[in-house]
């Protein structure tokens, strides 16, 4: 995707409260690139889940590694499970890589998962989340994220537009300590509370695992049958929420979520329940994680926290959303539904 210029004000801050750098600041000179290529580095990549969004992260990382002659020797997926993540990191450690990248889970207790890696000299770069107690440039190189506050604001604005600025809504959010999801969810709730006095969040349903979202939604819709909209933290649980809403025959409910996914996009294209998706640029974030690791491997000072753009996707700009967010054309069935 084409580079996006930094906004006048960057709203994202790192876990320590310091302002984030803009993602286009990450670059290597031709001489630095040649130096990295000559090192024959190796890397391991852990997916967060089996989503199109995370796959775009992986593709970005792979493309950057190819450009820098970094060989990917290990790959895993944690499905947001800190126990599985610990197992994956142990498997990665056995491969003796130079670089490991992932999104840490359950931040207050996950440091022991990563301690053996950095203590062995592995360069750690993270997606959005940082283990509690870790300092950039010490235990890890840096982390890259989306404009997480802006995504929450965008979601609130799309919800308000969809329900006419008034009525009851539900919010299905991440219950665990997850810096990026917690920040995005909180920004949504804060914007609704402060900017839309005629919209009431009837209840916030928190999930620890995405597969809990359907049951939570079903229970809350029984409790609050008059809700006009549902906000869902991100697209994976949103798929289950969407199926639940459809099974109940609630074609009237407007759903807003975050992160592009074909199931959600197809429903949007068909004029279904999903009316807004707050999006970011996962390909660019995957690419950036590889660059940050390369910085550390050649001793170049790296920003501790880096952010990248967010934007609203509705039915009107869905095709462009695919290009900007995932760096691909929308699937044929999504294109057909838009033209139908």
Predicted feature residues:
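Short beta-strand elements in bilobed, periplasmic/extracellular small-molecule ligand-binding domains
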Residues: 66-79, 168-171, 192-210
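Structural recognition of the beta-strand scaffold that forms the well-ordered cores
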Residues: 43-47, 54, 73-75, 99-103, ...
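Extracytoplasmic "Venus flytrap"
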Residues: 10-60, 64, 68, 73-91, ...
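Hydrophobic alpha-helical
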Residues: 99-119, 188, 202, 206-267
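Short, solvent-exposed amphipathic alpha-helices that sit
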Residues: 53-68, 151-155, 179-199, 216, ...
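Hydrophobic alpha-helical segments within soluble ligand-binding/sensing domains
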Residues: 26-28, 143-169, 183, 212-214, ...
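Flexible loop/hinge segments that line or gate small-molecule binding clefts
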Residues: 107-108, 112-150, 168, 261-270, ...
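Hinge/cleft segment of the Venus flytrap/periplasmic-binding protein
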Residues: 2-41, 172, 176, 180, ...
């Amino acid at each position: 995707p084409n580079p996006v210029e930094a906004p006048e004000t960057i709203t994202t801050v790192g876990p320590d409260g310091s302002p984030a750098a803009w993602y286009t600041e990450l670059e290597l000179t031709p001489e630095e690139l040649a130096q990295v290529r000559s090192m024959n580095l190796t890397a391991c990549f852990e997916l967060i889940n089996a989503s199109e969004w995370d796959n775009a992260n992986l593709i970005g990382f792979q493309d950057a590694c190819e450009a820098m002659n970094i060989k990917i020797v290990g790959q895993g997926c944690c499905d947001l499970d800190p126990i599985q993540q610990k197992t994956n990191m142990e498997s990665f450690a056995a491969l003796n890589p130079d670089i490991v990248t992932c999104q840490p889970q359950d931040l207050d207790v996950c440091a022991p998962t990563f301690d053996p890696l950095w203590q062995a000299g592995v360069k750690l770069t993270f997606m959005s989340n940082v283990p509690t107690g870790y300092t950039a440039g010490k235990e890890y190189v840096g982390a890259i994220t989306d404009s997480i506050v802006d995504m929450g604001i965008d979601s609130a604005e799309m919800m308000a537009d969809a329900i006419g600025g008034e009525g009851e809504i539900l919010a299905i959010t991440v219950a665990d300590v997850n810096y990026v999801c917690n920040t995005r969810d909180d920004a949504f709730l804060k914007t609704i509370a402060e900017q839309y006095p005629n919209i009431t969040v009837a209840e916030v349903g928190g999930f620890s695992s995405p597969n809990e979202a359907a049951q939570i939604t079903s229970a809350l819709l029984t409790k609050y049958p008059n809700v006009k909209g549902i906000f869902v933290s991100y697209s994976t649980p949103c798929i289950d929420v969407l199926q639940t809403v459809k099974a109940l025959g609630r074609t009237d409910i407007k759903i807003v979520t975050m992160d592009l996914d074909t199931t959600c996009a197809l429903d949007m294209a068909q004029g279904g329940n999903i009316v807004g998706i707050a999006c970011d640029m996962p390909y660019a974030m995957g690419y950036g994680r590889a660059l940050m690791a390369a910085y550390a491997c050649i001793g170049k000072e790296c920003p501790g926290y880096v952010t990248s753009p967010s934007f609203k996707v509705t039915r009107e700009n869905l095709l462009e959303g695919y290009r900007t967010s995932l760096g691909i054309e929308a699937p044929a069935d999504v294109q057909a539904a838009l033209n139908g």
